[in-house]
Amino acid sequence: RGSXLTHLPLRNISD
C-alpha cells in the first residue's frame, strides 16, 4: 500500500 494506488478500490495491490 502506498503505491499510489491506495485511492483505488483495488486493495489487491498491496504495493
From Swiss-Prot:
Its main location: secreted. One of its GO terms (biological process) is proteolysis. It is an enzyme of class 3 (hydrolase). Its EC number is 3.4.23.-. Expressed in chorionic epithelium (trophectoderm). N-glycosylated. GO terms for cellular component: extracellular region. One of its GO terms (molecular function) is aspartic-type endopeptidase activity. Keywords: Aspartyl protease, Glycoprotein, Hydrolase, Protease, Secreted. It is found in: Secreted, Extracellular space. It comes from the Eukaryota. Belongs to the peptidase A1 family. This is Pregnancy-associated glycoprotein 62. It comes from Bubalus bubalis (Domestic water buffalo).
